[in-house]
Each structure stands twice: as C-alpha cells, then as structure tokens.
Amino acid sequence: MSWFSGLLVPKVDERKTAWGERNGQKRPRRGTRTSGFCTPRYMSCLRDAQPPSPTPAAPPRCPWQDEAFIRRGGPGKGTELGLRAVALGFEDTEAMSAVGAAGGGPDVTPGSRRSCWRRLAQVFQSKQFRSAKLERLYQRYFFQMNQSSLTLLMAVLVLLTAVLLAFHAAPARPQPAYVALLACAATLFVALMVVCNRHSFRQDSMWVVSYVVLGILAAVQVGGALAANPRSPSVGLWCPVFFVYITYTLLPIRMRAAVFSGLGLSTLHLILAWQLNRGDAFLWKQLGANMLLFLCTNVIGICTHYPAEVSQRQAFQETRGYIQARLHLPDENRQQERLLLSVLPQHVAMEMKEDINTKKEDMMFHKIYIQKHDNVSILFADIEGFTSLASQCTAQELVMTLNELFARFDKLAAENHCLRIKILGDCYYCVSGLPEARADHAHCCVEMGVDMIEAISLVREVTGVNVNMRVGIHSGRVHCGVLGLRKWQFDVWSNDVTLANHMEAARAGRIHITRATLQYLNGDYEVEPGRGGERNAYLKEQHIETFLILGASQKRKEEKAMLAKLQRTRANSMEGLMPRWVPDRAFSRTKDSKAFRQMGIDDSSKDNRGAQDALNPEDEVDEFLGRAIDARSIDQLRKDHVRRFLLTFQREDLEKKYSRKVDPRFGAYVACALLVFCFICFIQLLVFPHSTVMLGIYASIFVLLLITVLTCAVYSCGSLFPKALRRLSRSIVRSRAHSTVVGIFSVLLVFTSAIANMFTCNHTPIRTCAARMLNVTPADITACHLQQLNYSLGLDAPLCEGTAPTCSFPEYFVGNMLLSLLASSVFLHISSIGKLAMIFVLGLIYLVLLLLGPPSTIFDNYDLLLGVHGLASSNDTFDGLDCPAAGRVALKYMTPVILLVFALALYLHAQQVESTARLDFLWKLQATGEKEEMEELQAYNRRLLHNILPKDVAAHFLARERRNDELYYQSCECVAVMFASIANFSEFYVELEANNEGVECLRLLNEIIADFDEIISEERFRQLEKIKTIGSTYMAASGLNASTYDQAGRSHITALADYAMRLMEQMKHINEHSFNNFQMKIGLNMGPVVAGVIGARKPQYDIWGNTVNVSSRMDSTGVPDRIQVTTDLYQVLAAKRYQLECRGVVKVKGKGEMTTYFLNGGPPS
C-alpha cells in the first residue's frame, strides 16, 4: 500500500516493458481538483470503511533468501510457475566456492592462483550454514548417528588401551605410571561410553566428550613415548597414526578442529621423538619420514572428512528442499485450484478436471461442457459515460478504477446471490439461479441492480463526472458452460441471454425488466411502462414488453429493513473478528501424509497448524523438519529397510535406485590415492636404500595411477577430450560397479608400492651370521652378542653375505602398509562390506608375507638391532650370558594386532558413512515420492490455469510475495488485435426440441472455436494470445509481452494477419464438411493497449484501449468473408508485401469516417 494525500491507495503492480513506457507513464492530472474520478478519494470511497494503517514494514529476509534462495521470478520476466531450486548453501562448501571467489573483490578472478589457493583453503575450513538455526537443525539431523558412532569409538578405544597394555606388560616388567595411565584412560572411555548411551545426552555434550577424548589420546601418546623401551623415533608410529585418523573420521568434530587436532597430535609425537632421541645417529632421517607419514595421514583424514561432510550437508539440504517443496506444493496447488474455481464454477471445473485426468480416447467431437438451467434471471449492466471517464485516467488508473468498481460489483453479486458471468469492457453481466436454482432469482437481480445504481451514484457524487448505470434484466432459460480448448471463460447462451443483452437499452439510473421478470417479482416492486422498443430495434422486432422499476412495495421495504437489521446485528457481533473484505489469499496448509508419517510425523502435527500459519515459509519448513528429526528413529529405519550386516536395502527396487547414485567426486578419490602413493614413495626413498627395481616399480605404478586419475577427471571437463575418452570416463564414474572396481584397483596399486620394496632388501638372518662368527647356535644369539660384533641399527651396507642392501627400519613398511589401507577409506562410494573384504585380503597377504615369506627376516633382524640400539643408548655393557631380555613384543607379532585395530576402525567408519548415506537416501526418497506426486498435480493444475489466464498473469496471482491488493496491469506499446465473428451464427442458432434446445448448435460452435484454438496453438502462432470469445466472436492479440513482441521486425503483427487468413480457410473447410454457409467477418487493428486483470475475487484477463475499440469496429463494419484492417496496419503489411486493397471510407461509430483496407493474401512465396 502507498500513502497519497493522506488516503489509502491500492498498490498497482506496474508491468512496464520496453515497448510500453510511453503508454504506462502517468500523465499529469488536469487541474487541481482532488475529486476527480481517478483520485485516491474515489478509490477509498469504494472500499469498506476502515481506519488508515501505517505501511507494514518489509519482513526481514532470512539467510535462505539471499544468494542461497532463488526467489520466484515475477510476471513479465518470462518465468514459468513451478518449483525453484533451493540452494541452502553453507559458508565453505564446494557449491559456494565460486560465489566466495566472486565476492572476494574484482582482483580475484576464477582460475587465478589466488582463486585456487582460496578454494584450497576452503577445504580446511569448518562447514557451517549461514543460518544458526539451520546449523542447529543439521546437527540435530545427524545427532543420533554421531551418538552411535561415538559410542562405538569408545569401545574401540577401550580395546586399544587393552592392546597397548598387553604390548607393554607382556615382554618385561611394566612401568607402573604407564599402566596406571592406560587403566585410567580405559576407565574414562568406559564412563564416556555409558554417558553417550544415555537418553539425556545432548549435542553440546558431544563436543565436550570429543575434546575430552582428544585430551586422553594426547596423554596416552605422551605416556607411550616416555615408556618405550628401547627408544627410537620410529618405535610405535602406528599409535599416533591411528589417533590422527580417528580424529578425522570417528570423532564428530568440525573440520578446523580436526585439522588442528590432527596436526597437534602429529607435532606432539615429533617433538617427543626429537627430545627423547637426540643422540640417535639417524634421528633426522626418521623424523623426516615421520613427518611425511603424519602429513599423509592428515591428508587422508581431510580427503575423507571433507567429502563425507559435504555429502551429508548436501543430503540434508536436499531433504530439506524436498520437504519445503512438499509443504509448499499443497499451498500452491490449493491456490491454483482456488484461482481455477474463481474463474469457473465448481461443477464445471471439476467435470473438466475429471475428464483431463481420465484421458478419454479421442472422439469425433470435442466434449462440450454445457448445462441447461431453466428459471433464471440475467442482468446486463453498462456504465454510461465510461468513455469520458477513461479519458481522464492513465493506464494504471484505468485498471485501478475498473478493478475497484467491478470488485465492488462482485461483492454485491455475492451478497445478492448472483453469479458474475463476464466483464466486457464496461459491461457487467451476471445471472441468479445458477448453479443452484433459486425461487427468488428475479428479486436477487433487481436488488443487484439497485445496489449497482447506488454504487455508481456515490461515484458520481464524489467525482463530479456524469456517470450512471443502465441495467436490464430478463428471466428465462440459459445454457451455461465453456467453449473451446484454450482460455476458458464461463459464459451463458440462449435467446433469453440475447434478449437480456438488448435490455441494456434503458434509461440511465433505472432498472429495465421484461414481463417475464415482472411475473417472478410477485408484485413486490412498483413498475411503470419501459417502452424499450422505442430505444432498441431488437426489442421492437420481438415485440418485447418492458417495464421500469419505480421502487419496492411497502411489504418489500419492510422485509428489506428486517434483513438489514439482522445483518447489522450479525456484523456487530463479529466486529473485530472478521477482517475487512479483500481477495482471498490465505489457504490452510496440509502437511501430513503417508510418507511423512513413515518419517516420524503423524496427524498430531495438525494441532500446531494454527501456530504454523503465522510463521514465514522458511521458518515453517525448519519447524516441520525439526519435529521430523526429533520423531524419527534411526534404529527403526534401519530395522525396517536395511539389512543389518550387509547394509543393503531389503527391497530390490530401493537397492537398484541407490546403486544408480553417481558420486561426482570419484576423480578426487583417485587423485587422493595418487597423493598417498607419492607420500609412500618419498618415505621409502628417504628411509630405505634405493634400487633400480624399486624405482621401476614406483614409476610404473605412478603412470597407472596418473592415467586412472586423468581418465576419471575427464568426466568433469569432458568437452576438452576425445569422445571415446569421455565415454570411458562416464562409464566409470556413472556406474557404481565400475567405479568400485577402479577404486579397488587404485588401492591395490598403492598397497603394492607399500610392500614391493621389502623384496629388494637383504633377507639374510643376522642370527645366522653372528652364530657362525661366534661359533654358537643361532638360538643363543642375543643383542649383547651383536653389540660385541659392532652391529648397529641404521647401516645400509649388508651386515652378512649378499649384495642386497639392509632395510633397517621396517616400522615404515608397517606404516606405509597402514597408509595404503587408510587410502581405501577415501573411496566413500565403496560399500562397507566391500571395504572389509578388501582390507581382509590385503591384510592376509601382508601377514603371509610377514610371517612366512622372506621379508620376515627383515623384522627379526630389526628386533635384534633395536635391542643393540637400546644397549648403546643406556651406555651399559653386558656379556652374552647376562644380557637383558627384550623390552618389547616383536614387531612381526605386533603387526597382526595393529592390523586388526585399524581394520576395525576402517570398518566402523565405512559402516557409518554407508549407513548415513543410505538413511539419507531413504529419507530423501520418501520426501521425493510425495513431492513428485504433488508436482504432477501442480503441473496438471497449471495446465488448467494456463487455459484460463496467460502464464505471466497466472504467475502473478500465484506468487507468494504478491500482496492482497496488488493489481496486474501492463502497458503495451504496439499490439495487434483481432476480432473474428461468425456473422450469420445468430440465424443458425435456434432452440428446438430436435436440437436439445440449442445445445447442438452450441456443440458446432464449440467445434469451430476448438479448431481456432488448435490453430493458435501451432508454433508459428506462438506470439498470439487468445483473449476470449464473446458469443460467436473470437478475440486474439499479439505482442502482449516481451517474449512475443517484435519491435524491429513486427513479426507479431504479420503472425496475426496470417492467423486471420488461416481462420478464413478453416471456416471454408468447416462449411464444406458441416454443410453450412457460415460467413466470417474479421477486423484487425494495431496500436497501444492496456492489458490487465479485472476482478479481485474472480480475475479476468482483458485488454482495453482505443486500439481494441477500433479493432472491434473493423469487425462490426466489415464485409462477410473479408478481413478489414486499418490504415496503420495496412502500412505495416504493405511493407511486408501482403496483398491488400482499399475499401474506401467507412463510417465508424465514435470515430467518424475512416479509410479501411481488405487483406486478400500473404506476400508472394
């Protein structure tokens, strides 16, 4: 609403276009008089009295309405009705990286180095929705899963402390401090597991538990480093690697916290290794290898955490989007149906919808939706002096004026039990007695006429302009319904309707009735002779006796006074409860459905509906989603739909749908595997001696992985590569089976690189060499014997016979093998059971090689040399007899247990990822199914609506942002208008029992109009818009919006001319096959018009202006079987080489004499 001169004026939704600025621009008012017809004073006088209220403040935009929420385009922008994508957007996602780069300033260009660094930095940032409320919803959404995951992690950590305690206590006397630390850690883990399983456990507590766990892990790591015996920078590397990995994958913390924690644990171990092993000769080599090992573990953690969280957030926002659509679609469908029923009576609309829905087979004739009603009264009312009124208004004010006046008439019609049929320019006609019969139909029409005259008298007093109403009423029989296939409008036909139309020829301010109507009034009104035949030739020819209403009889006045008193009493009792009359826009929302009940929502949601209607749409969706999250049971969903161990869906169709899911990040997974391979290569090149075989194996594996990465990357940038390569890439990425095979192949290559170098090392047992030198049995050799022979840890030269180099630090073989297993966790699309099988096979191969193969001697030699290293560090000297026992479990016996712990963690993470993905898929699928059903209904309703209103007009009336009192109006600079009438149809139409009282005549008219509608639907006539039919007259126009207006080529004008000629040809074809002799008269004109919608409760699209009037005159003054055009149109068509001839000067009502032309044909082909 806007304030002008202190009075309330309805806001007009101006649709000014490039071709309509001049016509849409307001002209200055004449004089300074404020009582003009188009002034705000007149507008307020037509409204119900109410105190002025301030303009409501615009509601605050929630974060979803920024870049993230794509608002529905308004009319005039070429937008279609329908769902819009909802990109919920969190601050640091892949989807927002481009936005973030673009928003960084003009110096940040896509593809630049700075942009690439910015995108890389976003990977390390915590993901968070812009809306704090939405972020809380997301955390609640995954809370149950995170709670379950955290509980299982506590169990794994209890197992880990038991393993560490066994490794520490088994070989020698344990250190009490370290044992106490592990016991405390285990006790805390058990306590935390109990806490996590409590129903009172909350989201905030989860963060606390996570950070407590990190603190315990750091303490255990420090204790393990201090308790190690013997000490070495490479001893116990697997433990911090495990801690770093579970920090990223099994602890429910944000990315930034995970990165800091992972790097913190890694740095802590490096510092401890440096401080505790300062005298080690090979300290820096091992610290460098340790740093690479930890850095690779952090990279794997990031490559696992980032896509998993992004996928979860995208699944959440997609689910929310589907729920939002599911909640909003019923509203939109209800709005569409309400709009449909505001244009067509319910009985007609429902019958048409049922026929469309059942998709009946083609019939020889189109079905006609006509009903016959006897004993009705028809009122035609015309505004006298409207032309002079319109000349004082701008285009905007004209639509505003008509809307306010006819909206008042619509309200009066509803109060007087009349059904408005149509608005034709300034003519308003309605019927009482349909669709439900009424005995007092004549009284209702007379009272309607009295109210209309009172309303226009008020306008006359306020404006000072001589306007009045001419009202004519006749009672009889009508056929009502719709004709044609497009732009349906409810209408009535019959001889009685024709007669009622001519009854308009009355004195201004009087109600003109026929004797048939008078008979139904039962003497309740005083009348006088109307002498209608003196003013209308049709009435004279038909010998119609007419009367003028003088006033109500005394009895009728008393009845009306009593009714008015009852209405006032009722209105006073409802005062303050009922709002002022405005077009209906509020619709109740239906949220419960079968699928939603499956998701945890039942009919109890209806109890909160009243509160929900007060929420804005975004808050309503969040409120509903919050209830759904609280109500759903993860365990129940798993039990009902997912197999327990395999995590496959119980239903085959669901499993097939899930298997068709495409993971677009698969190329990134393979790239991460390549990165892990590079780290393994660097570690082994740094720690172990080089060999030609080793370098050859690494080069081959690198080439294979690089080819795999490039092949998968083609999927994302396919246009740059050959078609065959693109096809191969698509076949890998889009197929879950193919991508799984490629993923397993990549992990096998990385695993091969981790173990291949073991076969190039020296496999001679040191015990055998030393025993031979000392002349003792190999079983008697101890670390003290090796110390006496000056054997030490870290020498690359062969210690015994042979030329193969010595691999002194097999801990890194174990570490590299663990990295290769961790690389499998990056491939999120591989099923948990598939990963478990792969880990089992790879672990079994490694253990067989370790325990039974030649590489086992490398680990035996390492254990002995590590003992020598410990003796050297202690500076104590022992002989071979009293040499102390080894202070640790042999590495090759520790490795199977380490593998078991890692395999358990990897499997739990795989289960968590797959379970989350499948439950998200299931929830989204349930919401999608209902959404698709609603979309089908929406598209179905939309097709019906577009058969009533143009698309942009329907979009305007269905827009959620539209205000109740907004009008639709559009100024169009150059529009071609056509009126095509069947000149002699009135002679053909007769009402006889043989033709079902005229229904068969209307059936033929329906076929004719349907043919015209089918022609206008052709692609070549896409610039044309059917406006309406008026009896047997067909009205169309072209160039009414930006998509159909051709300013330069004027193709929309020639299209209408071609259409007019097609109608002439079609009429000849109809005459040949129906054995009739219908004659068409067609009139064409061009110029500016005002297009808009009149009627608030029952919107009716129409166009107004001098252009329309002249076009109608071209039809009425035309010649049968000819197309008459104006001079303006002649100039355009002649320039296009159309064939025209001059008719000469024609007298046109209201315009004087005009030179017109006949259109004979199109341009030469």
From Swiss-Prot:
ATP binds at residues 382-387, 424-426, 470, 1028, 1102-1104, 1109-1113, 1149. Signal peptide: none annotated. Phosphorylation by RAF1 increases enzyme activity. Phosphorylation by PKA on Ser-659 inhibits the GNAS-mediated increase in catalytic activity. Phosphorylation by PKC on Ser-553, Ser-659 and Thr-916 inhibits catalytic activity. Mg(2+) 1 binds at residues 382, 426. It is an enzyme of class 4 (lyase). Residues 1-149, 304-670, 911-1165 are cytoplasmic. Keywords: ATP-binding, cAMP biosynthesis, Cell membrane, Cell projection, Cilium, Glycoprotein, Lyase, Magnesium, Manganese, Membrane, Metal-binding, Nucleotide-binding, Phosphoprotein, Repeat, Transmembrane, Transmembrane helix. GO terms for molecular function: adenylate cyclase activity; ATP binding; metal ion binding. SMART domains: CYCc. It comes from the Eukaryota. Belongs to the adenylyl cyclase class-4/guanylyl cyclase family. This is Adenylate cyclase type 6. The lineage of its organism: Eukaryota, Metazoa, Chordata, Craniata, Vertebrata.
